[in-house]
Design a protein with these regions (language model features):
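Short, conserved beta-strand element in jelly-roll/cupin
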Residues: 88-103
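Ligand-binding loop in jelly-roll beta-barrel domains
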Residues: 123-146
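Bacterial N-terminal signal peptides
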Residues: 8-15
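Bacterial N-terminal signal peptides that target proteins for export
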Residues: 1-7
Length: 149
């Protein structure tokens, strides 16, 4: 009995001490200066020029299961058709720091989202995405990514 109790205490101590020495999870902050544009000068900024469409993306957080992601994205002028049976492959929340976007859903309804406004595009949305350029904070979620883990 004594040995069993000692083993239980030793195991509990090992579990607790392991937990105490695990990496601390901390919040991820983006400063005002970064949101004003400095974030796009970071080494991890991904800059693209795809057929004249220029964009810069800085991912600020990705969950361990890859299902949830946040970041700051800057786009030049763009027209994009989001089509097909699957539509948008993930849900996305967008908050516009500058610029605007015109969203035309597949039923023809139109929504304009301006600087200081936000919109959520549900997974599966289809339509047209038109802009003269913008900078956004974004959050994406894709439950299918979590299922892959």
């Amino acid at each position: 009995m004594y040995k069993a109790c000692f083993a239980a205490v030793a195991l509990s101590s090992a579990i607790v001490s392991t937990g105490l020495h695990a990496e601390t999870i901390k919040p991820v902050k983006v400063s005002k200066a970064e949101l004003a544009g400095a974030i796009f000068n970071r080494n991890d900024a991904v800059k693209k020029d795809d057929g004249g469409h220029r964009s810069t993306d800085v991912v600020t957080f990705t969950s361990p299961d890859n299902a949830y992601q946040t970041g700051v994205y800057k786009s030049g002028p763009l027209h994009e058709d989001i089509e097909g049976p699957q539509g948008l492959p993930y849900s996305e929340f967008l908050y516009f720091l500058s610029g605007s976007v015109k969203l035309t859903s597949s039923d023809g309804s139109v929504m304009v989202v301006n600087t200081g406004e936000a919109v959520t595009l549900p997974k599966g949305w289809t339509g047209q995405f038109d802009t003269q350029g913008y900078t956004k904070l974004y959050v994406t979620y894709d439950a299918d990514e979590a299922k892959k883990q």
